[in-house]
């Protein structure tokens, strides 16, 4: 959406750089990524943009707003905070994009989202984008959008990601060991591991580091600056394993991830789709392995396989420690 927004705003520039386009996103990492896209695509335009999010001091963000911005990328909490302080003005907003709409609601931002929507004077250019659209998102669309058109992009077989999906029975305390064995056998260099809890990310990362594997993790309790440093190391290829929770990983855009490990089965089917979609990009073959540690996890992965229509092949380690079909 960045390119058409830049094109439209550049065709009718305003000298005072008033806020005309707002992009709302659930996480700091994704906000930064979107801001980088506007920076790259709008390099030779006279439009200004700013990125605001919580977890850091607001003074630099306020200074950018006071200088005037045409485009604002924001997370809900910091946006409402600065709006309530009088630093963000939505009266002349022309374009509003709600990115990762489903995740926004899952994270409990529904109240902030509706407050923002209520303050927008015109909803003729209101767009919602998400890899998966929940019923709650559609409810918002029907209430706030005028004569909305629903556009679904279908994957054709030629461009469908080639991701081999596997499932493996692994005890709770054996997940990091399983990752190490798979890495030793496959030689994969760039890997992502997803956990459902912050504690799990810490434990698995510590184990991998003890085994001499370059691994680091991010989650919601890690300071923003540290999270950005870890993500940049992964982008540069300096980490072999990047461990994260679902929310913290939003905004990571790396095309050559060899394998995705689901250390815990995600609670939502859409999270499974988001996770494995990190691999198999740019016409490369990807691999996703999900660890099953108890009966509820088995039931969840069975439901995911059925609902997403994916074949998830059972695998195990044989007596020699090699991977084989179960």
PLM feature segments, named:
Residues 1-326:
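Conserved helicase RecA-like core
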């Amino acid at each position: 959406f960045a390119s058409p927004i830049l094109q439209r705003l550049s065709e009718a520039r305003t000298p005072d750089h008033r806020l005309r386009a707002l992009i709302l996103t659930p996480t700091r990492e994704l906000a930064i990524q979107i801001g980088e896209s506007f920076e790259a695509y709008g390099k030779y335009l006279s439009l200004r943009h700013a990125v605001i999010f919580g977890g850091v001091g607001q003074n630099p963000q306020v200074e950018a707003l006071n200088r005037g911005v045409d485009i604002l990328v924001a997370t809900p909490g910091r946006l409402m905070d600065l709006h309530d302080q009088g630093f963000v003005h939505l009266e002349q907003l022309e374009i509003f994009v709600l990115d990762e709409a489903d995740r926004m609601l899952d994270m409990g931002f529904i109240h902030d989202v509706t407050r923002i929507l209520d303050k927008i004077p015109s909803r003729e250019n209101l767009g919602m984008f998400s890899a998966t659209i929940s019923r709650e998102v559609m409810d918002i669309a029907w209430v706030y959008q005028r004569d909305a058109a629903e556009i679904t992009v279908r994957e054709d077989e030629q461009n469908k990601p080639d991701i081999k999906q596997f499932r493996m029975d692994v005890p709770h305390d054996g997940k990091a060991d399983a990752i190490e064995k798979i890495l030793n056998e496959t030689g994969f260099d760039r890997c992502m591991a997803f956990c459902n809890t912050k504690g799990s990310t810490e434990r698995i990362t510590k184990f991998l580091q003890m085994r001499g594997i370059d691994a680091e993790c991010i989650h919601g309790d890690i300071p923003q600056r540290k999270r950005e440093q870890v993500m940049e190391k992964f982008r540069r290829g300096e980490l072999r394993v990047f461990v994260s929770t679902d929310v913290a990983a939003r905004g990571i855009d790396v095309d050559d991830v060899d394998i995705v490990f689901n250390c815990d089965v995600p609670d939502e089917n859409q999270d499974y789709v988001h996770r494995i979609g990190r691999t198999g990009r740019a016409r490369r073959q990807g691999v996703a392995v999900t660890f099953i540690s108890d009966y509820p996890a088995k039931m969840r992965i069975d439901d995911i396989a059925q609902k997403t229509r994916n074949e998830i092949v059972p695998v195990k380690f044989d007596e020699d420690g090699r991977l084989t079909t179960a």
